[in-house]
Amino acid sequence: MRLVIARCSVDYVGRLEAHLPSADRLLMVKADGSVSIHADDRAYKPLNWMTPPCSLVETPITDEDGEATGESLWVVENKKGEQLRITVEEIHSEQNFDLGQDPGLVKDGVEDHLQELLAEHITTLGDGYTLIRREYPTAIGPVDILCRNSDGETVAVEIKRRGGIDGVEQLTRYLELLNRDELLKPVHGVFAAQEIKPQAKTLAEDRGIKCVTLDYQALRGIESNELTLF
């Protein structure tokens, strides 16, 4: 991972155009090729970003005499031809880290079993729901359950034993990413847990995410559709 704190301006060129004027920002370049631009607010959300696969080309900026100005132009381009054009005026700090392979989120036994039970009995979320798959892979980690509602629209489900704000934020990130996929959108969100904290429920509802309280014992008591041996 490469972290650059720099004074920069940013232009997005693609389906629309957007401009960020000159300011101090964090430029984050990850090993997967993604590039994101952050300000010192907005929690985890970048001001702008480009997801992989994409390319990054850095070119020194010269004046009329061909002399280097000390500035550089970063051009980040995806396969659709959309570009982030980052004019780096001054670098305050730059560091590179090799974080290695991340083991991913490790669920406790109850959360893992809740996911298994809910996937098997997906109509717990509502009549007409059908399962697409468990652990649906994305660039930022697997979605616990991806399914369709009775209208045939995609639903991403995040499962927790105790649902807090962090879980809602995690589901929000998945929804932002999945809703860029033309084959999946619109993608709705369901935050499912045995217990949901009031602050998390308020945040979820504010973001249009449905909250569902799961009864673990009741789910365990539902007769399985799969053959089991005792």
UniProtKB/Swiss-Prot annotation:
It comes from Corynebacterium glutamicum (strain ATCC 13032 / DSM 20300 / JCM 1318 / BCRC 11384 / CCUG 27702 / LMG 3730 / NBRC 12168 / NCIMB 10025 / NRRL B-2784 / 534). Belongs to the NucS endonuclease family. SUPFAM superfamilies: Restriction endonuclease-like. Transmembrane segments: none annotated. The lineage of its organism: Bacteria, Bacillati, Actinomycetota, Actinomycetes, Mycobacteriales. GO terms for molecular function: DNA binding; single-stranded DNA endodeoxyribonuclease activity. HAMAP family: NucS. Pfam families: NucS_C, NucS_N. It is found in: Cytoplasm. One of its GO terms (cellular component) is cytoplasm. The gene is nucS. Its EC number is 3.1.-.-. It is an enzyme of class 3 (hydrolase). InterPro entries: Endonuclease_NucS, NucS_C, NucS_N, NucS_N_sf, Restrct_endonuc-II-like, tRNA_endonuc-like_dom_sf. Cleaves both 3' and 5' ssDNA extremities of branched DNA structures. This is Endonuclease NucS. Keywords: Cytoplasm, DNA-binding, Endonuclease, Hydrolase, Nuclease.
